């Protein structure tokens, strides 16, 4: 079948604006996502803190009690097991784990006691009851307690199902990416 040259050229011209539009939208989307990523924006899909858009705000001081932080957990057997059990999501931190959003409730030199719930320097931490088993009935092993070492932090989330320092103990403060700032969030 012969298609006249004029008709073939006309079809090519009609397809070019569509391709150009798709390419432009794709580049704009990639640019926006890249700018957001490098600007410190992250999406939280875990129930430990409100769902939605968060921002990592750099800090130029040591972390303090009360700071809500983004932190990369260390590469430990406890973290690998937590990832395998589904407590932690995949991400870009060492060990392939996503950063955690948690509150710092104890810093170096503070005494943490873990029993039915958590006490820091003899003061009870609200919403810190321990779970003996996870949602699938598997046993949970709590941290035994002790003094938070130098350059470490003890983390907590008030969400009852949170996997935090109640179970894995203090972790290196060097993993802190920055303060966690809510941008556009929703607390279910």
UniProtKB/Swiss-Prot annotation:
Record keywords: Conjugation, Periplasm, Plasmid, Signal
Highest taxon of the lineage: Bacteria
Gene3D superfamilies, sorted: Umud Fragment, subunit A
Any one Pfam family match given in the protein's UniProt record, by short name: Peptidase_S26
Compartment(s) where it occurs, according to its Swiss-Prot or TrEMBL record: Periplasm
Span of the signal peptide: 1-28
The keyword Iron-sulfur is assigned to this record: no
GO biological process, one term: signal peptide processing
Chief site of localization: periplasm
GO molecular function: serine-type endopeptidase activity
GO CC entries: periplasmic space
Family stated for the protein in its record: Belongs to the peptidase S26C family.
Record function comment: Involved in conjugal transfer of the plasmid.
Protein name as it appears in the record: Probable conjugal transfer protein TraF
Species the sequence originates in: Sinorhizobium fredii (strain NBRC 101917 / NGR234)
